[in-house]
Amino acid sequence: MLKSRLRMFLNELKLLVLTGGGRPRAEPQPRGGGGGGCGWAPFAGCSARDGDGDEEEYYGSEPRARGLAGDKEPRAGPPPPPAPPPPPPGALDALSLSSSLDSGLRTPQCRICFQGPEQGELLSPCRCDGSVRCTHQPCLIRWISERGSWSCELCYFKYQVLAISTKNPLQWQAISLTVIEKVQIAAIVLGSLFLVASISWLIWSSLSPSAKWQRQDLLFQICYGMYGFMDVVCIGLIVHEGSSVYRIFKRWQAVNQQWKVLNYDKTKDVGGDTGGGAAGKPGPRTSRTSPPAGAPTRPPAAQRMRMRTLLPQRCGYTILHLLGQLRPPDARSSSHSGREVVMRVTTV
């Protein structure tokens, strides 16, 4: 509507410029009787008759210029787009196939490299099901060499692998080690060498007849005590860091040995109750009847983990309580508040 008004205003302005404003324009009369008309410019949906009457009222009966008379001519617009052709029957089959693949009937893929069977045979080595069920044997061996664990991180099932043979020493590959792992290996090696040398010298010095004068010397007796203390420290260091170095060795062994990974066999799964989560397969079916009253029941995995966590705390609390009982009565009564605070912190 606003566009139509602006167009008519410009046409009036052109007409006034061309005619010089000699003849006054008659005011438009409302159409349709008394008060029935709107008095506004014609809408696009008005009839041709109403439009001609309005133009005659505005411009009169004098001939107009081509630019003014051609405003009512329809403008040629862009042609309508052609209708799309009907899809062939093969396209419908392909669409239904893609929808069926998206709905879950997809080709199995390796959960590590996300490749299909074209990259190698897909195995199912653990209880996991669904999209994380299959994996390639080389991908699994590489994953084990990086993590150092031979169990699935989702269902906690230990992979069933068979060692075929060790690779040629010329084909051995090094594994990536962090700074902490290098320090652990160095501590184990140096501690073992010192422990072997110290124990060998102590045994020779205590049993050899030629070392009788050493056993009687005070300086050597002090050395015996120092070497004994260092031997205890080395044994504790080896015990503490032994598990970490053993995992590093298992990683190296996974890379430099040929393996055969076996598929998951539900009939041979004796630890099916330890698998957890929605990603794991259910273990072997057990009887739904309740066990006998006298039969021992095995606590679940979560309860066993909680017991392992609480056991050191309870042991520490018990030792602290026994040490408090060994104190004299006066000292125990004077430091009762401080001991209570320490016991509470240890329990938390």
Swiss-Prot record:
Binding residues for Zn(2+) 2: 126, 128, 152, 155
Keywords: Golgi apparatus, Lysosome, Membrane, Metal-binding, Transferase, Transmembrane, Transmembrane helix, Ubl conjugation pathway, Zinc, Zinc-finger
Enzyme class: transferase
A single GO cellular-component term on record: Golgi stack
Pro residues bias: start-end ranges: 76-90
CDD domains: RING_CH-C4HC3_MARCH4_9
Primary localization: Golgi
Segments forming RING-CH-type zinc fingers: 102-162
EC number: 2.3.2.27
UniProt topology in membrane: Multi-pass membrane protein
GO terms of biological process kind: protein ubiquitination
SUPFAM superfamilies per UniProt: Formin homology 2 domain (FH2 domain), RING/U-box
Positions of Zn(2+) 1 binding: 110, 113, 136, 139
Domain notes from UniProt: The RING-CH-type zinc finger domain is required for E3 ligase activity.
UniProt function note: E3 ubiquitin-protein ligase that may mediate ubiquitination of MHC-I, CD4 and ICAM1, and promote their subsequent endocytosis and sorting to lysosomes via multivesicular bodies. E3 ubiquitin ligases accept ubiquitin from an E2 ubiquitin-conjugating enzyme in the form of a thioester and then directly transfer the ubiquitin to targeted substrates.
The protein's assembly and partners: Homodimer.
Protein name per UniProt: E3 ubiquitin-protein ligase MARCHF9
Organism: Mus musculus (Mouse)
Gene assigned in the entry: Marchf9
